[in-house]
Amino acid sequence: VNITSFNFDKSKVHSILKDKQGNIWLGFFQKGVMIVPPVINNFKYMGYKSSTHNTIGSCCIMSVCKDHSGSYWIGTDNDGIYRIAPDGKQQAHFEQRPGIGHSVSSTIMSICEDSDRNLWIGSYRDGLARLNPQTGHCEYIYLPDKDQKPVQSIYSIIEDKHRQLWVGAMGAGLYRINLDTKEIYRCPSTANGFEYRPLSNILHNSWINCLLCSTNDKLYIGTYDGLGCLDIPTMDFVSTYEINRLLQGDVIYALYEDLHHNIWVGTSQGLKQLNPQTQKVREYTISDGLPSNSISAIEGDANGNLWISTNFGISRFNPGTQTFVNFYASDGLQGNEFSKGVSFASTQGEIIFGSTSGITYFNPGEITSPNKNPEIR
């Protein structure tokens, strides 16, 4: 194990011990003890804690995407957007330039590459834009709110199989853009709640965090107050009273559809499994093995496992055995706190999670379960 790759003050190490399990114990002057396990998982990292050259600054990561060429697009809080080559080298850094109307916004909340390889970005203050990946020039798209004022905060962007771009805004609801005709539609919103008005064009909450297009042509909408479900062919919101009753009040940060078409919902109060056929919801919390009830993002691997980032580590969940395996900084992560809603799974199977200190990315097949806790007497 190369212990120098870990983030600690090497000048403060006063003693070193290797135990029977292969763990290396480091004793620090007035700083306590650090344990380095014998097998470090192949969690890769980009960020300011890197022992090599930092390519993405020191700001919190707010969005991430991997494009058709394999380049990483990383949106930050107050430092624009970075383009990183597959080998980890910085290709571009586009940041806000005061007085220049077509420069990128400072805080990028969402990134999406559409089927035409256009790159769309949603910002915290400047709304929706289409980004030229070579020049950084932004074409801002006017999205009107109910008062015809431009929408500012875009937290989620996704394309469906009908070549429609869905845009989730904070406080302004849901928008649909036809990529062929360029027409823009706004889905109405009301406080009455779609669960009380089946098959009506109503969304329960206009503060949208995340979106998911399912295989059965439904758009799931995670909001600050529960879950919405839109039938895309008919453009009607589907009433699911029991689901709304169980999820209403939850802040939803993440949505994922598994290989069996269950919808997994990451909330501020734990992980929820939704079966669209039975309309049943199952809940998982710390008492079931999660490292934290505050779920940040959810992705899946080819074996049907879920990978869940939280505000206290990453968890691998096997739905078949109903077991969680948790990973922390001591298992090779560069930190335990991950950003809300920031994740991406590439077509090659790589999973990426954004955090407060950079991005963690890995191939699930290269990650092994951590050793048992070392014996302390």
Predicted regions and their residues:
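Carboxylate-rich, polar loop motifs that coordinate divalent cations or form catalytic acidic clusters
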Residues: 1-377
